[in-house]
């Protein structure tokens, strides 16, 4: 990393948690990732979900076909775990270089997770095979019981699922995705080299007051939901600490404006256009710019056993205005920090 007055040069980053959707939406949103990020772990929660090698190969090709000319971008594909998925399918996908990782959604925990897992113990044969092969398990870490408060679901997931899982599969490589609580940050920080976590820009910049005070702000609504300020501060401390177990994962999750601004709005923040600038802002505020490159560009590849990118990207302390909306077909998307002026600009 090179730091000059008002500029910062870092290895080109990767996004270790990304939703690209499909069809017209894919073509609308992909350029905002590929212009800043060299690789991204692409989530499999399409309708229907990506549960076979053939589906995954076809989806990967649709992504590659949508990459703008002049952009160098590699999608890293994932398999959607279900109660019925076989060990043979998962391991075949890994051997063929199709599945980089497997994604565990508890059933009905978030967008397009109805086909998700209903029994964690039922997946133990998959976890054993993944532990032996070194394949990472990516987890949306929330319990879904109706009697558990939505703000408590991540902390309860640690107690009910993560602790037994780590006990039973101590060398299974696990990414606790988009962590949102002090408990999760502490759990990962105290773990070993087989445990890591991604953190989103919205959970670093905002807490539930920002979403709910003065009216409901639907474009900050995501799952796991924003928590109290004490959790936000714990996440900021974790992300900027320099610990290698924490790395960038935007969880950029686009929805058309009409589906966000509705009586039953969808969960997800479309942050790809502004994520890198947002992370830089947080690290600057925490006086930790010296750790930004590791968080964005080094820790993730190291955990996945991949080389860091050789290309570089430059961030400059220059004001950048965020547009209010982005076209997607005949409708629009609202980007994270829409209408605001950012402190940082990216020179790709």
From Swiss-Prot:
Entry note: cofactor: Binds 2 Zn(2+) ions per subunit.
Please give the Pfam families that the UniProt record associates with this protein.
Amidohydro_1
Keyword Hydrolase on this protein? Answer: yes
Q: Which PANTHER family match?
A: DIHYDROOROTASE
Instruction: Please state what class of enzyme this protein is.
Output: hydrolase
What PROSITE patterns would the database entry show?
A: DIHYDROOROTASE_2
Q: In which pathway does it act?
A: Pyrimidine metabolism; UMP biosynthesis via de novo pathway; (S)-dihydroorotate from bicarbonate: step 3/3
State which gene encodes it: pyrC
This protein is called Dihydroorotase
Q: Which residues carry this modification: N6-carboxylysine?
A: 103
Biological process, per Gene Ontology: 'de novo' pyrimidine nucleobase biosynthetic process; 'de novo' UMP biosynthetic process
The opening ranks of the lineage are: Bacteria, Pseudomonadati, Pseudomonadota, Gammaproteobacteria, Enterobacterales
């Amino acid at each position: 990393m090179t730091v000059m007055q008002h500029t910062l040069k870092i290895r080109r980053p990767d996004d270790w948690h990304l939703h690209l959707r499909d069809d017209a939406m894919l073509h609308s949103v992909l350029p905002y990732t590929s212009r800043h990020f060299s690789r991204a772990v692409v989530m499999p929660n399409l309708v229907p979900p990506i549960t076979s090698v053939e589906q995954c190969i076809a989806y990967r090709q649709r992504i590659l076909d949508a990459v703008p000319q002049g952009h160098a971008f590699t999608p890293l594909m994932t398999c959607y775990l279900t109660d019925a998925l076989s060990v043979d399918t998962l391991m075949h996908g890994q051997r063929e270089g199709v599945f980089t990782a497997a994604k565990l959604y508890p059933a009905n925990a978030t967008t397009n997770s109805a086909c998700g897992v209903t029994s964690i113990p039922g997946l133990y044969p998959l976890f054993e095979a993944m532990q032996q092969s070194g394949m990472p398990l990516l987890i949306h870490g929330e319990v879904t019981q109706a009697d558990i408060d939505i703000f408590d679901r991540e902390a309860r997931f640690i107690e009910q699922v993560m602790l037994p899982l780590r006990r039973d599969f101590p060398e299974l490589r696990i990414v606790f995705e988009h962590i949102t609580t002090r408990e999760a940050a502490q759990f990962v920080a105290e773990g070993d080299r087989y445990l890591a976590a991604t953190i989103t820009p919205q959970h670093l910049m905002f807490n539930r007051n920002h979403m709910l005070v003065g009216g409901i702000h639907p474009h900050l609504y995501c799952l796991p939901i924003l928590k109290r300020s004490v959790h936000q501060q714990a996440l900021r401390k974790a992300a900027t600490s320099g610990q290698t177990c924490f790395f960038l994962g935007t969880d950029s999750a686009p929805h058309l404006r009409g589906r966000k601004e509705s009586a039953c709005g969808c969960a997800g923040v479309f942050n790809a256009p502004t994520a890198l600038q947002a992370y830089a802002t947080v690290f600057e505020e925490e006086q930790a710019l010296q750790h930004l490159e590791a968080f964005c560009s080094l820790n993730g590849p190291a955990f996945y056993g991949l080389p860091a990118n050789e290309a570089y990207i430059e961030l400059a302390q220059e004001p950048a205005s965020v547009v209010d909306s982005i076209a997607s077909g005949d409708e629009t998307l609202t980007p994270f920090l829409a209408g605001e002026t950012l402190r940082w600009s990216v020179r790709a």
